[in-house]
Each structure stands twice: as structure tokens, then as C-alpha cells.
């Protein structure tokens, strides 16, 4: 019996890993907790999970962001939006026949390394049932920005406190409000631009200049 490979996640890295597994003739399966390929690039207005914002675009040009063996369409702008990126990832998965190897709505809950070097993977299947399987190889492609980290500050704050993971787009309730954004990374800068469209004033607090 051939050795098995488990790929966790069907985002940009996961489908690339799957394509290479397929071309190498490996026996593999992809476990994806959502119902689409694309990972964080699949927009969903619901909170409680990581995804792009309503107006997210690439911050690097398409020529620097595309797969070397599957270029982005010529009619895409230099900086595609998230809808176009999702279409691109879906096209990639179809082109390389990856869909047949993906188990959607399968959430990995725990992975344990065995004494013989194999991996025991626990997951919930698409019916919510607990399952587990042994794989000889494991490829973790689920990213590392799915669990929000909240800073701890002394004192009390009575206004609305929102983590960037929960942000999907500016709401009407932001209009004419004062907004403080903690941090100056990609998420912070994206949200600052969106907030500035409707808020009274937007401040950014950063650890270093």
C-alpha cells in the first residue's frame, strides 16, 4: 500500500502543494474546513474566522503574485481584488484537477506525531462527525493568522473594541466616530484607509516608526 500524504488547507499554498503531490504521483488528500478553495481570499461577511475585507486588493502586482505555471488572466488589473483572486485559485484547482482530492467542510482539530514518524490526524467531517486517519506525511498549509491575539492594557475602555479578524468592511456605525488603530501592519493600514472614508478622525498607534 502506498504511503499517504495529508495536506491541511486548500488556500493558495495548499492547492500548490496538492498540485505538486499529484504531479509526483503521490497518494494524498486535502482537508479544507470551508466549502471553497482560496483560504483567506474567500470573502465571507460573517465574523469569527479569517478572510479578506470587502474591498481587499493585492498589494503586490499580479506578475509578482501569480503561480509560475499558471499566469493570471490578461484582463485582470495589475492589482486584482479578492473576487478575482478567488476565481484565479478556483481556475488553478480545476486546471490541475485538484478538486477530486479535496474534502471540503473537513476541519482538522488535532494532529499527533506517532513513534514511527507517521501522523495521526483528527478531524470533523462534513457531517460534523469525529474521524481520524494515519498519514505517513503531513503538509500544513492552513496559514498562521486564524486565531486573533488581543493585547492586554491596564484600565478600562468602554467603546467598541474590534480585532482585525472581525473586520469585513466599514459600517455606518463608524460614521463621524473617532477611531484608533493599534499597529501598522498590512491589516492596520488597510483598515485605516477604509475607516478614513467615513470616520471623523483616524489615529494609528505603532510600536516603532
Where are these regions (language model features)?
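Glycine-rich dinucleotide-binding loop and its adjacent helix/turn
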Residues: 75-77, 81-85, 101, 140-198, ...
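Feature captures the FAD/FMN-dependent oxidoreductase FAD-binding
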Residues: 77-142, 146
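The conserved SAM/SAH-binding core of class I Rossmann-like methyltransferase domains
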Residues: 8, 31-32, 182, 205
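Short, solvent-exposed loop/turn segments at secondary-structure junctions
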Residues: 13, 35-37, 47-48, 70-72, ...
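N-terminal Rossmann-like FAD-binding beta1-loop-alpha1 element of flavoenzymes
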Residues: 3-30, 189-195
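Conserved acidic residues
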Residues: 4, 136, 177
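Short, conserved catalytic or adaptor-binding loops enriched in Gly and charged residues
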Residues: 56-59, 97, 152-157
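Glycine-rich active-site loop/strand segments that organize a redox cofactor
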Residues: 33-36, 40-91, 205-209
